C-alpha cells in the first residue's frame, strides 16, 4: 500500500513544473499565432528555424537533467554546502555545452542555403536564427539553476520565473513584431529579439534570487566556497550525456516519422501536425510530473530508502495515468470535431479523427516511459536509458511505422500505430531496469 504522503508530495512538487511546461506550450501557440498573423512567409521561416532549435534545446535540457540526481541525493543527505559547490560546476558544464552547441549551430547556419529551403525565406531565416543562437547559452545557464532548484524541492521559483518570462515574451512579440509603443515593425526578427530578451531577463532574475534570497543562503555559501573540480564536472557529464541522447533520440524519431508522413502528401502532413500539437500537450504534462518523480526518487536514494524510491515512482505513475485519462477522454468524445478547430479542410478533419485511437493507445506507454526514465535518472542509472531509447525508437518504432504505413499500406494511421509500440516497449524496458536496480 502506497502512503498518501507520496501522492501529496509529488503533487506539491510536480504541479509547478507542469504549469511551467504548459506555459512553454502556450508561448509556442502565441508565437505561431502572432507571427502567422503578421506574414505567412514569416510563419514558414519560423517553422523551419524553430524545429531545428527545438531539437537542440531538448538535447541541452536533457544534459542539464544530469544535475537533478546529484543535487537530490545530496539534499536527501542534508549536505547543502555540497549542493552549492555542485551548482558551480553545473554552471561551468552547462556553459561549455552551450558553447559547443552554439559552435555546432553556427556550422549549420553557414550551410543553411544548402538545406533545400525556399530561397525567398532565407533573408527572414538568417537573422531570426542568429538571434535564437545568442539565446542558447542563457537557456543552458537558466537550466542549471532550474535543476538545482528542482533538486532541493523548490519547484515554485522556476515556475514563477517561467510564467513571468513567457508573459514578457508575448508582450515583446506584440511590441516588436507589429511595431507598437514607438518601436519599428520588425516581424519575425522582433519575435526572436523578444525571445532572447525574456531568456536573458529570467536568467538574471534567477541569479539575483540566488544571490539575495535567505532560502538559498546555505547553498550560496557552498557555491562561493566550493571549487571547480574534475570529479563533479565528470559526474555531471556522465549523467547528462545519456539523458540528452535519450531525449534527443525520442525527438529525432518523431521528426523522422514526420518525414515519412510527408511522403503521403500535404493533407496527411497537416493532420499529423494537428495531432503532434495535441500530443505535445499531454507529453509536457506527463514529463512535468515525471520530473518530480526524479526529484523524490533522488532524495530517497540519498537516504538509502529503497522502499521510498519504489513507492515514489509507483505513485508518480498512478498520477500520470490519471492525467492520461483526463487528456484522452475529451479527445475520444470530440474526435470528429477536433480537426475542425485547426482547419476548415474536411479531409484533414477526417484524418485527425482516425488518429485519435492510436494516440489514446500510446498514452499508457508514454506515461510509463516518462515515469521510469525519470525514476532511473533519480537513482543516477542513466546509461541503460540511452541504449533502451535507441532500441525502442530506432529498432522498433521507426521500422514499424514504415511497415504499417507503406508495406501494409495503412497510410497515416499505420505510421501512428507504430508510436504505441515504440513508447510502450521503452516504458516496459525502463520499468524492468528500475525494478532490477531497486530490489
Question: Residues of each region from the PLM?
Answer:
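Short runs within selected transmembrane alpha-helices of multi-pass transporters and secretion channels
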Residues: 64, 132-150, 158-166, 191-207, ...
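Helix-terminus/linker motif at the lipid-water interface of multi-pass membrane proteins
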Residues: 22, 26-44, 112-119, 175-188, ...
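Small-residue-rich hydrophobic transmembrane alpha-helices
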Residues: 43-106, 139-158, 258, 271-335, ...
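Transmembrane helical elements of multi-pass membrane transporters/channels
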Residues: 12-31, 131, 142, 165, ...
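N-terminal transmembrane alpha-helices
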Residues: 2-33, 37-38, 54-66, 70, ...
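Short alpha-helical transmembrane segments in multi-pass integral membrane proteins
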Residues: 1-17, 71-137, 183-241, 297-362, ...
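Transmembrane alpha-helix boundary/anchor motif
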Residues: 30, 66, 103-107, 116, ...
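Transmembrane alpha-helix boundary and packing residues in multipass membrane permease domains
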Residues: 17, 21, 32-33, 69, ...
Amino acid at each position: 500500500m502506497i502512503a498518501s504522503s507520496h501522492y501529496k508530495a509529488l503533487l506539491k512538487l510536480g504541479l509547478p513544473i507542469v504549469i511551467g511546461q504548459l506555459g512553454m506550450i502556450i508561448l509556442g501557440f502565441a508565437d505561431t499565432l502572432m507571427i502567422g498573423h503578421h506574414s505567412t512567409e514569416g510563419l514558414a521561416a519560423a517553422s523551419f528555424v524553430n524545429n531545428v532549435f527545438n531539437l537542440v534545446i531538448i538535447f541541452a535540457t536533457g544534459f542539464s537533467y544530469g544535475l537533478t540526481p546529484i543535487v537530490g541525493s545530496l539534499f536527501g543527505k542534508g549536505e547543502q554546502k555540497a549542493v552549492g559547490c555542485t551548482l558551480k560546476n553545473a554552471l561551468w558544464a552547462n556553459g561549455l555545452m552551450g558553447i559547443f552547441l552554439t559552435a555546432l549551430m553556427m556550422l549549420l547556419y553557414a550551410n543553411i542555403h544548402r538545406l533545400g529551403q525556399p530561397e525567398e525565406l532565407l533573408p527572414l531565416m538568417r537573422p531570426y536564427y542568429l538571434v535564437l543562437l545568442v539565446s542558447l547559452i542563457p537557456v543552458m545557464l537558466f537550466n542549471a539553476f532550474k535543476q538545482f532548484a528542482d533538486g532541493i524541492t523548490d519547484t515554485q521559483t522556476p515556475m514563477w520565473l517561467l510564467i513571468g518570462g513567457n508573459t514578457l515574451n508575448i508582450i515583446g512579440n506584440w511590441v516588436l513584431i507589429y511595431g507598437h509603443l514607438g518601436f519599428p515593425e520588425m516581424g519575425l526578427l522582433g519575435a526572436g529579439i523578444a525571445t532572447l530578451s525574456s531568456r536573458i531577463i529570467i536568467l538574471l532574475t534567477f541569479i539575483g534570487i540566488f544571490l539575495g534570497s535567505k532560502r538559498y543562503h546555505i547553498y550560496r555559501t557552498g557555491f562561493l566556497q566550493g571549487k571547480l573540480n574534475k570529479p563533479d564536472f565528470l559526474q555531471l557529464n556522465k549523467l547528462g550525456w545519456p539523458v540528452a541522447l535519450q531525449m534527443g533520440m525520442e525527438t529525432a524519431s518523431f521528426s523522422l516519422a514526420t518525414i515519412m508522413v510527408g511522403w503521403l502528401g500535404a493533407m496527411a502532413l497537416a493532420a499529423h501536425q494537428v495531432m503532434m500539437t495535441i500530443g505535445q500537450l499531454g507529453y509536457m504534462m506527463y514529463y512535468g510530473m515525471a520530473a518530480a518523480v526524479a526529484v523524490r526518487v533522488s532524495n530517497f536514494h540519498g537516504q538509502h530508502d529503497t522502499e521510498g524510491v519504489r513507492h515514489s515512482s509507483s505513485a508518480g505513475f498512478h498520477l500520470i495515468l490519471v492525467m492520461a485519462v483526463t487528456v484522452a477522454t475529451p479527445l475520444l468524445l470530440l474526435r470528429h470535431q477536433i480537426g475542425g478547430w485547426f482547419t476548415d479542410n474536411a479531409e484533414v478533419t477526417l484524418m485527425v479523427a482516425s488518429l485519435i485511437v492510436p494516440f489514446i493507445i500510446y498514452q499508457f506507454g508514454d506515461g510509463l516511459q516518462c515515469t521510469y526514465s525519470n525514476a532511473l535518472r533519480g537513482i543516477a542509472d542513466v546509461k541503460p536509458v540511452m541504449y533502451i531509447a535507441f532500441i525502442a525508437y530506432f529498432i522498433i518504432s521507426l521500422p514499424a511505422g514504415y511497415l504499417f504505413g507503406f508495406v501494409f499500406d495503412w497510410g497515416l494511421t499505420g505510421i501512428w500505430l507504430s508510436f504505441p509500440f515504440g513508447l510502450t516497449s521503452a516504458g516496459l524496458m525502463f520499468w524492468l531496469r528500475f525494478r532490477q536496480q531497486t530490489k
